[in-house]
A protein has these predicted regions:
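Conserved ABC ATPase signature
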Residues: 144-148, 152
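Catalytic Walker B motif of ABC-type/P-loop ATPase nucleotide-binding domains
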Residues: 169-172
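ABC ATPase "signature
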Residues: 228-229
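Conserved ABC transporter NBD signature motif
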Residues: 58-72
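A short, proline-enriched helix->beta-strand linker immediately N-terminal to the Walker B motif
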Residues: 163-167
Length: 252
């Protein structure tokens, strides 16, 4: 089943064309990684997919339900009530966590399920405790973000996204703000989600991790998808731009 479908997406910031006719389909249980140099449009594509940025052109649907349609060459968004229901299909983990600093861990996890999804507090708190256990964060329920390491904050952010029971989980460079040791903690969690067949779209600079975990990889540059395929196909590509990009990582 197709969980996410984007067709012919274009996005401009003033005179700068950031996305140039990009299409993306993600199926149930698939892990898709998006790689490429800074400024290639990776994060903008993710923000368009999660309705944080508006597309100038293109359409978008989740599980066959249209969020954005094309009319006369322009994107037309559904009404807010429809978009609100569609947002329930996905979760997003940011590179800088975006936890509420004045909420403790438990409230960061439970606030949206209780007040937005109108779920029962007992059920929500039980789910939160189970997720914190899976994240290796038992005992941190009453801690505030300022009392946690970066790796712990990112694991709380992942747990918070999972609290809403999303069909698709998006990651926008989830380890870019972490040192190598803490990066390993977060990648371990994402790896475990992949083993559970969680549908994920991951923007990342972790090349070895992308190669290991992904069913499919997109290499973007200057607003277009230059190479797309399995990890083996992408990392063995003879495309000169792809080879040059990978060469810079191997030289580090």
């Amino acid at each position: 089943m197709i969980y996410l479908e984007m067709n012919h997406v274009k996005k401009n910031f003033d005179d700068l064309e950031v996305l140039k006719d990009i299409s993306l389909t993600v199926e149930e249980g698939e892990v898709v990684s998006i790689i490429g140099p800074s400024g290639s449009g990776k994060s903008t594509l993710l923000r368009c997919a999660t309705l944080l940025e508006t597309m100038d052109c293109g359409d978008l649907s989740y599980l066959g339900k249209k969020a954005v349609t094309m009319e006369n060459g322009h994107s037309v968004y559904e009404k807010p009530a429809v978009l609100g229901k569609i947002r329930e299909n996905f979760g997003l983990v940011f590179q800088n966590y975006n936890l509420f600093p004045h909420y403790n861990v438990m409230r960061n996890l439970c606030d949206a399920p209780i007040h937005v999804q109108k779920r029962q507090r007992d059920e929500v708190e039980q789910q939160a405790k189970e997720l914190l256990y899976k994240m290796g964060l038992t005992g941190k329920e009453k801690a505030y973000p300022c009392q946690l390491s970066g790796g712990q904050c990112q694991r709380v952010a992942i747990a918070r996204a999972l609290m809403l029971n999303p069909k698709v989980l998006f990651f926008d460079e989830p380890t870019s703000a972490l040192d190598p040791e803490l990066t390993g903690e977060v990648l371990k969690v994402i790896r475990s989600l992949a083993e559970m067949h969680m549908t994920m779209v991951i923007v990342t600079h972790e090349m070895a991790f992308a190669r290991e975990i992904s069913d499919r990889i997109l290499f973007m540059d200057q607003g277009v998808v230059v190479v797309e395929g399995t990890p083996k196909e992408v990392f063995s590509s003879e495309n000169n731009r792809m080879k040059g990009f990978l060469g810079k990582f191997r030289d580090k």
